[in-house]
């Protein structure tokens, strides 16, 4: 993910960062305060009642396992991409695409034969669920992500083989779930700021438009607009502890943003959104004590 050639020596000089960095720091710190105030002013979570969708059957070493795939309008939808775009992202092993879902607690149930089993409720966005109903590909993807999420959360080892129940949309009863309720404060788009390298007399790579926001106190997201590109081929990305550097193929783009937060570069991920022609970057933040 790193390419040290992208770091221009003159940009490492604090004096060259100029007014843009100062304004950026003010905007980012303001957004951090807004997020903290929002968390104080409202409950961190809200209760939702998912609606039934479909139920799949699999198993673990401890017996039968059923997963109720549910939906709720309160769950945020994933980024709107076509199946072709999503398939290409997955083939390129990019981790920028996420399907928000709520993983419920295990509950003991009885199957059709009256034998004991375990059921889990997994909720996704209602509009996305409607789209998933007409797509075997999305259904397979959601089940795979749900299964892996349950394995990670509860230390399970589930059989990847599964089948969907024909005549039951859920097993047992679907309980309420708690989801995070805070909104993400947008940070002013840096592409609109006046910078020395955006003056009309400047020649060389174009500085792309950058959007940043705090998804949570420990997660910073970025969108870099690259309208001249059709894919990620030739893109160079470097993420430092407080630096985001993007270089385009054939010197089309160059972005060097100093971020006054500590980024976990090892855990950061990026994906190219083909329809929007954007580079999406997910950057977990390090705690002050780490």
UniProtKB/Swiss-Prot annotation:
The modification Phosphoserine is found at residues 12, 16, 173. It is found in: Nucleus. Its main location: nucleus. The record marks 57, 64, 113 as: Interacts with TELO2. Keywords: Nucleus, Phosphoprotein, Transcription, Transcription regulation. PANTHER family: PIH1 DOMAIN-CONTAINING PROTEIN 1. Component of the R2TP complex composed at least of RUVBL1, RUVBL2, RPAP3 and PIHD1. Component of the PAQosome complex which is responsible for the biogenesis of several protein complexes and which consists of R2TP complex members RUVBL1, RUVBL2, RPAP3 and PIH1D1, URI complex members PFDN2, PFDN6, PDRG1, UXT and URI1 as well as ASDURF, POLR2E and DNAAF10/WDR92. Interacts with phosphorylated TELO2 and mediates interaction of TELO2 with the R2TP complex. Interacts with phosphorylated ECD, EFTUD2/SNRP116, RPB1 and UBR5 and with RPB1 in a phosphorylation-independent manner. This is PIH1 domain-containing protein 1. The gene is Pih1d1.
